[in-house]
Amino acid sequence: MNAQERMARGPVWRLFLSMSLPAITVMLVMVIYNMADVYFIGRAGDTAQVAALALTGPVYGAIQGLGTLLGSGGCTAAALALGGGDKRALSAVTSFCFWGALGMGALLAAVGAAFAPNICVMLGAGADSAEYAERYVRVISLGTPCVLMAGVLSNVVRADGSMRAAMLGNGLGTLINVALDPLLIEVLGMGVEGAALATVIGNAAGCALLLRHIIRKQPGFSFAPGALKGEWRRCLNVLALGLPLAVSTLLSSCAGVLNNGLLAQYGDTAIAAMGVSGKVGMLAVMIAIGICMGIQPAISFNFGRGDAKRALEISRKTAALAFAVSALLSGACYVARDGFMAAFTSDAAVIELGRAMLAISLTACPLAGAYQACTAFLQATGKASYAIALSVLRQGALYVPCMYIMNGAAGLNGLMYTGAVTDVLAFAIAIAMCIGWKRRILRGELGEESTTAAKS
C-alpha cells in the first residue's frame, strides 16, 4: 500500500504513526533548534546577549511566517491536486512555491541587511542589548533565502506523504546548527553572530537535501517557470491556503515585538526571562502542531477526492490527540520547570521570574493544542477565510488588546497571564467555527471557497 492508498483507506491511528510521527520529530528538531542558541549564549552568563536573542526572535519568526505562507499553502494545494489527480495543478503549485521563496528571500535579505539598525530600534533594543541585536539581525537577514527556502521545501515535500524526507531535511539542519553553535559561539567567540551564522548554515544544508529528494523522487513536482504560465489563480489559492498559518506566525512576531516593548520597562531581566521561558513553553504546543501538520495532507487528500466522512474522522481524532499530548507535556514541563530554567541561564533573577512565567503559560497549553487542530481542519478542508479569522483573533484582535489591558491593570504580572487568557478565548471561538463548518460539510453546503480549493 503506497502513501496515497494509506491516506485513503489505511487505519487512522496508523496514519498518525506514519505521517504525524515524522512531523513531530521535525517539531522536536525545531524546538532543539530554537533552544540551542539560547543554551550556548546563556552559558556565558551575559543577560544582555540573552535579551538580544529574545528581542530578535520575532525577526526569525517573521521569516518563518513568510515561508509558511508558501510552504503550508503549497502543501495543502499540492495534496488537493494529488487527491484530484490534477498533474498540471501540481506542477504549477510546486513551481510557484520554489520561485516565490527565492524571490522573496532575496528581497528580504537586501532589506534586512540595509536596515538592521533601524529594525533593532523598532524591536525595542536597549543600550546594553542593541549592539548584539544588530549583529544577529544582519547575519540572519543575509541568510534569509536559505532559511525561507528550507521552510517552504520542508512543507511542500509532505504533500504526497513523504514525511521522512521532511524529517531528514529538518534533522540535518538542526544537527549542523547544534554542532556549530559551541564552535562559533564559544570557541571562536562570535556570540550572537555565531548563533545566527549556525542557523543559516544549518538551513542551507537542509535545503540542499530537500531539493535533492524532490528532484530524484517526486517527478510530479516542478521547478520550471513555464509551469506558472496562465496559472495565477492557482498561485493565489496557494497564498490563500497558506495565509492562516502565516498570519498566525507573522502576527505572533508582531505581538512579540509589542510584548518586548512593554517588557523593556521592567529591564533586560524580564525580557530574558520571557525569552527563556517561552523557548521551554513552546515544547507542548510545537508537538501539537507537529501532529496537526503531519496529518493535514491526509485530511486534504480525502476532502479533495470527495470523502468528507473520512476527512472528518481524521480531524476528530487529530483534535483529541493534540489535546491529550499537550496536556501530558504541559504537566511534565511544569514539574521540571526549575531544571529547565537553570539549564539556560545562571542569573538567579532570570530563573526566578522565568519559572513563574513558565508555570502560567503551561496552564492553557492543552487548549492551545486543540486550537491548532481546529485551524488545521479548517485549512485542510479549504475554508481559508475561517482559518485566517482564527489566526487574526488569536495573535492580534485578542492578544494585543489583552496584553495592553492586563499590563495596565496589573503590570508585569498582568503581562505574564496574557497568553493563557488569550488561548482560552481563542479555543472557544475555534470550536464554534469548526462545529458550524462541520455541519455545512455534512449537508453538502461547501460554498465556492472550498469547492475552488478542492479543485485547485
Label the model's feature ranges:
Residues 62-65, 177-182, 207-211, 283-286, ...:
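Hydrophobic transmembrane alpha-helices of multi-pass small-molecule transporters
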Residues 140-158, 166-174, 195-210, 289-292, ...:
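Short runs within selected transmembrane alpha-helices of multi-pass transporters and secretion channels
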Residues 50-110, 147-166, 260, 273-337, ...:
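Small-residue-rich hydrophobic transmembrane alpha-helices
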Residues 25, 29, 33, 63-67, ...:
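Residue-level hotspots within pore-lining transmembrane alpha-helices
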Residues 18-37, 139, 173, 202-206, ...:
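Transmembrane helical elements of multi-pass membrane transporters/channels
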Residues 28, 32-51, 120-127, 183-190, ...:
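Helix-terminus/linker motif at the lipid-water interface of multi-pass membrane proteins
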Residues 1-20, 78-145, 187-243, 299-364, ...:
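Short alpha-helical transmembrane segments in multi-pass integral membrane proteins
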